[in-house]
């Protein structure tokens, strides 16, 4: 037994010595672990846990190979562009001549008329096709959608790397680096927008600045050694930097002046070369560090310059990161210059090489500016100066500027947060983590890297500026809260790292005041979350090589840590320190990880919708238009390849009023007039510069009033209204009528779906929009309608019972052959009690035998729709009175009852929301020819 223990002890000692001698292996394993953790968290969506093992639901939300569809809505826009790029060599649906030049053209978005696209493909499309080519070469069943699904998860593997190295640089603590990286990786807001399936651009809003900050801090750390600025042009680093800048300049300039199909090739070359230089720079830095050689600061500064030059292609607001770093460098230089003259405090503050810091700043700012000018032109290059001046207005989504309704006021992620707690929760998961992160930022001015207390102001300056800017943006719209995630995560990591550094001073105060409580904290967390440990370790096995690769890497790190602790058993203080810091790290990372395990999100696109959209694609003319509310527009254009009235990229337009009006009105002639106008001439009748807008001197209210008068009537009556009532000339009246009463209108298909019932307060508010009210009138002061959903039961003998939940009350209607009674029921102390009745103005009852329409009480403020299917299923809806005869209600609840020109042609399953089934409905709009009289 003794021999076995001795052998085990020797083996552990050898392992510990090995990791100490080859410390880079430990760092490599930590990086690998962080990459695997990030991927695993983001891959959970592929398991479709939302279905709860319901095979029907899994089949509905996946393709024929069982691979889940993309999440959200905007990813389908980029998916369509990616497929176009693969099939056509550009992102357009076709090529059109625009301003005398052949240009890729999007036929379907905001159509007619659609719009031109740049030749240069978005970076997300290139990333999608890169994964597709690799994966498809292995598995021929893989589609471009399948590849797009994994883009955010693959790129998300990079998120933790810069955080780990930044925190490690600040604190010299691997524990702190891991804690900070995990905090970022698991931040709920960021996780949702970068999980597998969310193939959108948020990943590109975060990644560039993370790496640029890391590169800048590494460059500052290497400030003592320079090559270029001491004119050592034969130095390999000097040659590499010069060559990289020249090549980037040439390729970037070529991309800027290229035209036509060569732009696609140039952009691929630009991204490839930029990535190659960044990877080469990191490899060079790694090799030099392994050899124990000092790095020249120009190397990491070059990487920061290259990535800054690429950033505008990833996100339109790229300049905020450049401004943060530039402000930091300027303030840091000023602070160092002031502190350098203070002889008494110089020994406590790390001043460093001020001259080289100035050189570094010039290199980064000027180098970035030159590349930006070459690649994009002067406009983009100076946008870090010009953009912030007008961005405050852009951030304020409630600003009304055109007289038309502002759709952004109804987009949840653009709403202003109600509290700091909401911002912090969206940014990093909880108020507690955010507060600790802020404390870490405050503590970052202390340098405890070498068990000595010194002041180092650079980290606190950078992080304070970064956090202040991002939190300010978050106060203008909750979607920007994710921008504050990186500085808060770094702050958390610094806090943990500083505690470890303080413990390593081995004072009794540190060990007993921090070490032992930290250990107890870790044990309590382990105990509290013990039931979820297995899920945290293995959240998914969808990609086995990653899942089990993570466990192997974690096991190797655990073996190292055990050997490290055992090697210190003879030194009780050292043992307490190592055990305490390990438990502290575990205690910090487990809560945020447990909060996102399991993690699942259901797609919107599904096979029920696919069936309906495929029907449109196969059975309608190519010039057909789909009229719908904007939210699902990208899905419709992707699957049906038909024009849509508006979508998630064009929602804030006058069409929001017109489409809302078409659904909310009870006037069928007005509704089809609106649809006919939008489907054929788009915005021609009401855009700025149109006949009516010029006639009314850009008075939107008057323009809308005129159009609402002429759209429901035939052409001759509309002509009389325009010429006799409003005094337009014959020529101008006919120009208006060409847009509103076209001779050759595009066919139109209306789509309704169950969620439209839920969001009726939104589209009806726009449909009932009162243009005479001040533009900044709050939404809650405007007229809107609503529907409340419930169930209905046929009890036999002509008796029907309907139950609709309205907030916390049940509105019950009992109908029999002789009487209709109502009751409002509330649960009080667990008992259902009738607390009153309600008055129904109009009642619609649809059965397999037909529709019965009854007016019950002229004073009723609610109306009710009841639908009983042949198989016994029953549905009920309460409606506000202003929507009781709306086109939407008659279409979705009654299948077009009472309408002459809009007919149901296809209905398929809608599994996305509770409601009528089949609930995805397609209607053909028949304009007829009478309107041309």
Curated annotation (Swiss-Prot):
Membrane topology note: Multi-pass membrane protein
Site (Important for catalytic activity): 193
Transmembrane region(s): 23-43, 147-167, 175-195, 197-217, 237-257, 264-284, 297-317, 319-339, 362-382, 428-448, 455-475, 480-500, 582-602
Binding residues annotated for a glycophospholipid, in chain numbering: 479
Short sequence motif named DXD motif 1, residue ranges: 72-74
UniProt KW keywords: Cell membrane, Glycosyltransferase, Magnesium, Manganese, Membrane, Metal-binding, Transferase, Transmembrane, Transmembrane helix
Regions of this protein lying in the Extracellular compartment: 44-146, 196, 258-263, 318, 383-427, 476-479, 603-933
Binding residues for Mn(2+): 74, 200, 413
Localisation: Cell membrane
Domain of life: Archaea
Region Interacts with target acceptor peptide in protein substrate, residue ranges: 629-631
Pathway given in the UniProt record: Cell surface structure biogenesis; S-layer biogenesis; Protein modification; protein glycosylation
Paired cysteines (S-S): none
Cofactor: Mn(2+); Mg(2+)
Function: Oligosaccharyl transferase (OST) that catalyzes the initial transfer of a defined glycan (ManNAcGlc-2,3-diNAcAGlcNAc in Methanococci) from the lipid carrier dolichol-monophosphate to an asparagine residue within an Asn-X-Ser/Thr consensus motif in nascent polypeptide chains, the first step in protein N-glycosylation. Involved in the assembly of an N-linked disaccharide that decorates the S-layer glycoprotein and flagellins.
Name recorded for this polypeptide: Dolichyl-phosphooligosaccharide-protein glycotransferase
Naturally occurring in which organism (per UniProt): Methanocaldococcus jannaschii (strain ATCC 43067 / DSM 2661 / JAL-1 / JCM 10045 / NBRC 100440) (Methanococcus jannaschii)
Gene label: aglB
